[in-house]
Curated annotation (Swiss-Prot):
<dbReference type="GO" id="GO:0006511">
    <property type="term" value="P:ubiquitin-dependent protein catabolic process"/>
</dbReference>
<dbReference type="GO" id="GO:0005634">
    <property type="term" value="C:nucleus"/>
</dbReference>
<dbReference type="InterPro" id="IPR055418">
    <property type="entry name" value="UFD1_N2"/>
</dbReference>
<dbReference type="GO" id="GO:0001501">
    <property type="term" value="P:skeletal system development"/>
</dbReference>
<comment type="similarity">
    <text>Belongs to the UFD1 family.</text>
</comment>
<dbReference type="GO" id="GO:0032480">
    <property type="term" value="P:negative regulation of type I interferon production"/>
</dbReference>
<comment type="pathway">
    <text>Protein degradation; proteasomal ubiquitin-dependent pathway.</text>
</comment>
<dbReference type="InterPro" id="IPR004854">
    <property type="entry name" value="Ufd1-like"/>
</dbReference>
<feature type="modified residue" description="N-acetylmethionine">
    <location>
        <position position="1"/>
    </location>
</feature>
<feature type="modified residue" description="Phosphoserine">
    <location>
        <position position="299"/>
    </location>
</feature>
<feature type="region of interest" description="Disordered">
    <location>
        <begin position="288"/>
        <end position="307"/>
    </location>
</feature>
<feature type="region of interest" description="Disordered">
    <location>
        <begin position="231"/>
        <end position="256"/>
    </location>
</feature>
<dbReference type="GO" id="GO:0031593">
    <property type="term" value="F:polyubiquitin modification-dependent protein binding"/>
</dbReference>
<dbReference type="GO" id="GO:0036435">
    <property type="term" value="F:K48-linked polyubiquitin modification-dependent protein binding"/>
</dbReference>
<dbReference type="GO" id="GO:0036501">
    <property type="term" value="C:UFD1-NPL4 complex"/>
</dbReference>
<dbReference type="GO" id="GO:0005654">
    <property type="term" value="C:nucleoplasm"/>
</dbReference>
<dbReference type="GO" id="GO:0039536">
    <property type="term" value="P:negative regulation of RIG-I signaling pathway"/>
</dbReference>
Length: 307
């Protein structure tokens, strides 16, 4: 018998227009080349060899090209897209966070299969650190970061880069399926409380209970207005020689008025107090009547009276 696998790298297999093969995976930092490929770490896409593109072009693969990655040793799986086909044969390059989700080490085997995923309508994320709350607009930051992703899988911990800092988010829920495509989709995003977040404790003021309740019935009289209750001041700044000691005010000395319970809105009533006239005032008015020519005349030059 002859073995048809005479090459070091596995040959892709086709089952009913489905791409399926195994690659040895490495992190993007081990990708040889003059250009810095740190942009691959910021997304959810992998780099595959040119032979994969040749096989995919012969199949009736719907775009965008989405793949299911499976680590059979740990029974872990995730989904991703493809960025380029420039890797060496038999090798694929993955972002570091994706290798952590799959529990893969450098050079580990991963099963790659082409899949079709439904378009996402809802997703829920849980930040893995309370530092994520320092971001002013987290939804806008996440929307910008997800442009480098092709799909989401429930249970994955994705990594996004913002202001030169890496934030990890766990995908708690996706709809309509556990794995969804987020390319050209209208998706509602929600956040769960960050891992390790504690709500600030409210300071409750414990008031000491008294043996008996205080009687506040006498306070109403003290709150009434009392005219000229202050102390006077002189212009020269001196104080009076004898200052009378103010007598304490009792609640009964100041009486409050009784409200008019028959008051009607929009009606004004002028209340006047009737006071009896004093008899002395009447006598003064009677005695002080006007009498014409009752005074004495005066002249500028004194003249003697004729005998």
């Amino acid at each position: 018998m002859f073995s048809f696998n005479m090459f070091d790298h596995p040959i892709p297999r086709v089952f009913q227009n489905r791409f399926s093969t195994q690659y040895r995976c490495f992190s993007v930092s081990m990708l040889a080349g003059p250009n810095d490929r740190s942009d691959v770490e910021k997304g959810g896409k992998i780099i595959m060899p040119p032979s994969a593109l040749d096989q995919l072009s012969r199949l009736n693969i719907t775009y965008p090209m989405l793949f299911k990655l499976t680590n059979k040793n740990s029974d872990r799986m995730t989904h991703c897209g493809v960025l380029e086909f420039v890797a060496d044969e038999g090798i694929c390059y993955l972002p570091h966070w994706m290798m952590q989700n799959l529990l893969l080490e450098e050079g580990g085997l991963v099963q790659v299969e082409s899949v079709n995923l439904q378009v996402a309508t809802y997703s829920k994320f849980q930040p893995q650190s309370p530092d994520f709350l320092d971001i002013t607009n987290p939804k806008a930051v996440l929307e910008n970061a997800l442009r480098n992703f092709a799909c989401l899988t429930t249970g994955d911990v994705i990594a996004i880069n913002y202001n030169e800092k890496i934030y990890e988010l766990r995908v708690m829920e996706t709809k309509p399926d556990k794995a969804v495509s987020i390319i050209e989709c209208d998706m509602n995003v929600d956040f769960d409380a960050p891992l390790g977040y504690k709500e600030p404790e409210r300071q409750v003021q414990h008031e000491e209970s008294t043996e008996g309740e205080a009687d506040h019935s006498g306070y109403a009289g003290e709150l009434g207005f009392r005219a000229f209750s202050g102390s006077g001041n002189r212009l020269d700044g001196k104080k009076k020689g004898v200052e009378p000691s103010p007598s304490p005010i009792k609640p009964g000395d100041i009486k409050r008025g009784i409200p008019n319970y028959e008051f009607k809105l929009g009606k004004i009533t002028f209340i006047r107090n009737s006071r009896p006239l004093v008899k002395k005032v009447e006598e003064d008015e009677a005695g002080g009547r006007f009498v014409a020519f009752s005074g004495e005349g005066q002249s500028l030059r004194k003249k003697g009276r004729k005998p």
